[in-house]
UniProtKB/Swiss-Prot annotation:
Annotated coiled-coil segments of the chain: none
Gene3D superfamilies: Homeodomain-like (1.10.10.60)
Pfam families cross-referenced by the UniProt entry: HTH_8 (PF02954)
Protein's name in the database: DNA-binding protein Fis
Species of origin: Mannheimia haemolytica
Gene that this sequence comes from: fis
C-alpha cells in the first residue's frame, strides 16, 4: 500500500492577520496557543487530566468529520484513522456518536 506524503502540513487553520491577510497556521500552533492561554489562566494551580481534556477537544471533532467523510462507514473510518473498528466504536460511544 502506498502511503501519501504531503509536501506541506495539510492540518492547517486559515486565519486573518492584523492586515486582514489570510495566513495558514499548522494545527499544532493553534493547539499550542490555546494551551498557553489555558495555562496562563490557572493562577499557579496545576490542572488535572490535562491530557484527556486536550485529547477530547481534538478527538471528538476529528471523529465527527471522519464519520461524515465516510458517510458513517465505520470500517472505512477506522482504516482512515489507523485504528481497529472496535476501538472506533468505543470512541464513538464515548462522545455519544454511536
Amino acid at each position: 500500500m502506498l502511503e501519501q506524503q504531503p509536501t506541506q502540513n495539510p492540518l492547517t487553520v486559515t486565519m486573518l492577520n492584523a492586515q486582514a491577510q489570510q495566513v495558514n497556521k499548522p494545527l499544532r500552533d493553534n493547539v499550542k496557543a490555546a494551551l498557553k492561554n489555558y495555562l496562563s489562566q490557572l493562577n499557579g494551580e496545576d490542572p488535572t487530566e490535562l491530557y484527556e481534556l486536550v485529547l477530547s477537544e481534538i478527538e471528538h471533532p476529528m471523529l465527527d468529520m471522519v464519520m461524515q467523510y465516510t458517510r458513517g462507514n465505520q470500517t472505512r473510518a477506522a482504516t482512515m484513522l489507523g485504528i481497529n473498528r472496535g476501538t472506533l466504536r468505543k470512541k464513538l460511544k464515548k462522545y455519544g456518536m454511536g
